[in-house]
């Protein structure tokens, strides 16, 4: 009796294997072991944004994922996306090319020049933008979908999701009566392209404005684009507020963007808040941020106004490796870019270990 049960089990297993082969023939290699999935995820490359972002998101943004950048207009979302693009262009991250969906038609040379080291040439960065009239959301997303499916390992930016307008809204008379179809269109786009984005190793950046929600009894702000796109995004980073960055003469040289991790599917801690330093005409100030990140992870220690680290020059008779004041640390690092690169590597190793 036991032998018969074993034979039936073996026969059932054979049938399952035949069914599996038939399904693979029809749909492709859709069966993998759990260890294969783990190994595949382990080999994914993380693209850094900046030290402050990376130390809070678990090392940067993983290829094959969706990133949502949210906040009020003019708070630094586009600059942050361009910073990610600049880093992705570096050889150690695959010299990745960019498709920039400039739906708002606001990207200009000032934005490109405002991120130090960004290559805005057509070879590295293709910009899709309406010229004479608005292009409906369906057509815009079709162009982006074709780009996703026909290329590999690109940074693809939608700037912004909030500006997309459905075909019916674009062609009908202007009125406030019709409920926006955009969330449904975006949800469909996301569903169709979630797997191709992962398979092709892209990073899709969805820039979303905070919009006033007047349907509640009190004024609230909400991310535009609907729940579908928020559900799909692996990471959602939101700028809660900005504060001025003033120099010693009280002149504004930039702004501090105060971020919150709204969602993280990686090592980032949902709800974590941190500050990113955006310097006008330069982009995110890596030196300013790297000092903060290195202090958080113990690479730099501080006692009073003295900053101590193995890489700092020896001072005094005792030969202590320390300098007084953050400005002196920053000045030393700017004069020693090789040390900055070494610190970045060390930070990545700690964050991704």
Where in this protein do the model-derived segments appear?
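Peripheral, non-AAA+ core regions of ATP-driven protein-machinery
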Residues: 2, 24, 28, 32, ...
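Charged, alpha-helix-enriched surfaces in structured cytosolic catalytic cores
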Residues: 14, 18, 48, 64, ...
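The Walker A/P-loop phosphate-binding site
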Residues: 3-122, 146
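Conserved inter-motif catalytic segment of the P-loop NTP-binding fold
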Residues: 2-3, 83, 88, 92-179, ...
């Amino acid at each position: 009796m036991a032998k018969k049960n074993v034979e039936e089990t073996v026969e059932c297993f054979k049938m399952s294997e035949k069914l599996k082969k038939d399904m693979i023939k029809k749909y492709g290699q859709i069966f993998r072991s759990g260890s294969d999935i783990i190994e595949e995820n382990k080999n994914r490359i993380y693209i850094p944004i900046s030290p402050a972002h990376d130390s809070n998101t678990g090392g940067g943004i993983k290829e094959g994922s969706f990133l949502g950048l949210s906040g009020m207009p003019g708070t630094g979302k586009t600059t942050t996306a361009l910073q990610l693009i600049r880093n992705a262009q570096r050889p150690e991250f695959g010299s990745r090319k960019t498709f920039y969906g400039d739906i708002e038609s606001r990207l200009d040379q000032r934005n490109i020049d405002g991120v130090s080291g960004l290559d805005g040439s057509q070879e590295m960065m293709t910009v899709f933008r309406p010229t004479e009239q608005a292009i409906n959301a369906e057509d815009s997303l079709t162009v982006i979908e074709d780009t996703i499916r026909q290329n590999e390992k690109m940074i693809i930016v939608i700037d912004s999701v909030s500006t997309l307008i459905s075909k019916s809204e674009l062609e009908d008379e202007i009125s406030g009566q019709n409920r926006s179809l955009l969330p449904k269109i975006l949800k469909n786009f996301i569903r169709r392209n979630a797997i191709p984005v992962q398979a092709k190793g892209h990073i899709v950046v969805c820039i979303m404005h905070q919009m006033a929600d007047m349907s509640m009894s009190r004024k609230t702000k909400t991310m535009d684009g609907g729940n579908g796109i928020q559900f799909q995004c692996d990471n959602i980073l939101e700028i809660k507020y900005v504060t001025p960055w003033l120099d010693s003469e009280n002149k504004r040289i930039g702004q501090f963007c105060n971020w919150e991790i709204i969602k993280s599917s990686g090592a980032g801690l949902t709800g974590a808040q941190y500050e990113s330093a955006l310097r006008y005409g330069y982009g995110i100030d890596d030196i300013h941020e790297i000092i903060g990140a290195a202090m958080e992870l113990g690479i730099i220690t501080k006692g009073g106004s003295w900053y101590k680290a193995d890489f700092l020059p020896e001072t005094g008779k005792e030969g202590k490796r320390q300098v007084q004041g953050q400005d002196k640390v920053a000045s030393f690092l700017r004069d020693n870019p090789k040390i900055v690169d070494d610190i970045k590597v060390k930070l990545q190793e700690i964050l991704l270990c």
